[in-house]
A protein has these predicted regions:
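C-terminal amphipathic helix plus adjacent low-complexity
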Residues: 4, 9-50, 67, 71, ...
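Extended catalytic core of nucleotide-activated donor transferases of GT-like folds
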Residues: 1-3, 58-66, 74-183, 200-201, ...
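Short, surface-exposed amphipathic charged segments that create phosphate/polyanion-binding patches used
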Residues: 9-13, 163-166, 203-212, 309, ...
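Nucleotide-sugar donor-binding catalytic core of glycosyltransferases
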Residues: 19, 30-89, 184-336, 356-360
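Catalytic binding pocket for nucleotide-activated donors in carbohydrate/polymer assembly enzymes
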Residues: 70-79, 88-101, 105-109, 164-169, ...
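A short, gly/pro- and small-residue-rich
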Residues: 141-163, 230-241, 343-352
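Active-site regions of enzymes building and remodeling cell-envelope glycoconjugates
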Residues: 2-20, 143-149, 168-170, 185-192, ...
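Hydrophobic/aromatic beta-strand patches that form the interior of the parallel beta-sheet core
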Residues: 130, 147, 170-172, 190-192, ...
Length: 420
């Protein structure tokens, strides 16, 4: 912004207020630098004071919005471009709402914005806000509908704090592990599995499908798993995993008691690491007619994976192209079979091979759409079988569309308004 309008621009804008001036490459005297700094510091202090006042006004106005629900509904979705999944989920929901003719503001933060500035939401005056992993509800008025989809074990879910829930807050949970956390806080919720973005992930007939199996996703090993007191439980669980243990809820409770470990940590970190990383190592050790390709962060640290490691793919077109080129998509995960990667793969025509949680998980079963494995031999038998049966992805994709999720949101709003 022009230096002569610096104060006004900072006060009424929503960019983060700068902290320092960089004089690099400028041939100016120390005296001039000092004069600039003095003026800059005074301007910044004034801007901070005015910004607080204006934000307070925004918050007060937002809290007291009186909305007219007879007019077309306005939907507000905020996202951060530093997130790897959340921003794309929010964007897909926003795009689906737009396709249905809704008025939508998709507010993508790119790192320069002041996250405490509520200018856009004040100006837009939404009837509905939709958030991923965060409630973002304390500043909302009673009229606003707020939908929150928890897809990760956020700190405010795991800790013992109370969560502020309004009458028009509606919570969705991705996994049974998050169900448990919400139940502990006495928060009502609905189950919502991942959805598929069919605009990015679809059959591409220009890509030749080859006899190969691909894995796309990060390795789960981390420093938090290298502690001695964690290695003991890892060794114990790894032995059970290699012998085909089903890891029912009762079995997990038994392990929690035996090792005095937090159940959420065991399920979201230890089990996820063992099921994913060890399974990929199994895959790379099987000699079959299928070419193996592994993509994602962290796999180059495994010597056995390096010959098959192909780097990191960008979200969207690059991932879709790889899945369109593969016969199988390997997608082992402890908590759930219906991951984003499974949906993306099926939309692109690759048959998923997933870790078998049937019988111990309450998620839907799609035998007609995927292969299941629990042991090394299960995986080997799939890859060594010369007669691969065709799979039907239609039910899986239809039941996990963003259209269906958005319809659920719209139906919830309509029913709530009718019941008032």
């Amino acid at each position: 912004m022009p230096i002569e309008n610096l104060l006004e621009g900072l006060v009424y804008g929503r960019e983060r207020i700068p902290e320092i001036i960089d004089f690099s490459g400028l041939d100016i005297s120390s005296k001039v630098k000092m004069e600039i700094l003095t003026h800059f510091d005074m301007t910044i202090e004034q801007a901070k004071q005015y910004r607080v006042q204006i934000n307070s006004k925004y918050l007060s106005e937002i809290k007291n919005f009186k909305l007219d629900f007879s007019e077309p509904l306005r939907f507000y979705l905020m996202a951060n471009d530093q997130t790897t999944v959340m921003q794309f989920v929010s964007k897909s929901i926003a795009d689906t709402l737009k396709e249905k003719g809704c008025d939508v503001l998709f507010d993508l933060y790119r790192g320069t914005e002041d996250i405490t500035c509520f200018k856009k939401i004040y100006e837009y005056k939404p009837h509905v806000t939709i958030n991923i992993n965060h409630l973002n509800n304390r500043f909302l008025g009673n009229d606003v509908f707020n939908f929150v989809w928890f897809q990760d074990p956020m700190e405010h879910l795991v800790d013992s704090s109370d969560l502020y829930i309004r009458n028009r807050d509606y919570i969705f949970s991705l996994l049974p592990a998050f169900d448990m956390l919400l139940e502990k806080k006495s928060i009502p919720f609905q189950r919502q599995n991942f959805c598929i973005d069919s605009t990015k992930y679809k059959i591409d007939k220009t890509v030749k499908r080859e006899k190969k199996i691909v894995f796309i996703g990060s390795a789960y090993h981390g420093e938090d798993l290298d502690r001695i007191n964690v290695l003991e439980v890892i060794d114990y669980i790894m032995n059970l995993f290699q012998n085909g243990e089903s890891f029912s809820n009762e079995k997990m409770d038994e392990i929690v008691k035996k090792f005095s470990k937090n159940k959420t940590f065991l399920e979201t970190r230890v089990m996820s690491y063992i099921v994913r990383d060890l399974s990929v190592l199994w895959l790379c050790s099987i000699k079959s007619d299928y070419e193996v390709e592994v993509y994602g962060w962290g796999w180059d640290s495994y010597e056995a994976v390096r010959p098959y490691y192909k780097g990191v793919l960008k979200y969207g077109e690059e991932i879709a192209k790889v899945y369109n080129s593969a016969a199988f998509a390997f997608a082992p995960h402890f908590s759930y079979a219906l991951q984003n990667r499974v949906l993306e793969a099926t939309a692109c025509g690759a048959i998923p091979i997933v870790y078998d949680r049937r019988g111990v998980s309450d998620e839907p079963v799609y035998d007609e759409a995927m292969y299941y494995f629990k042991t090394f031999e299960d995986l080997r038998n799939i890859l060594m079988n010369n007669k691969i049966e065709e799979k039907d992805f239609s039910r899986l994709l239809e039941e996990h569309s963003y259209v269906r999720f958005v319809d659920k949101i719209l139906d919830t709003i309509q029913k709530s308004l009718q019941n008032e």
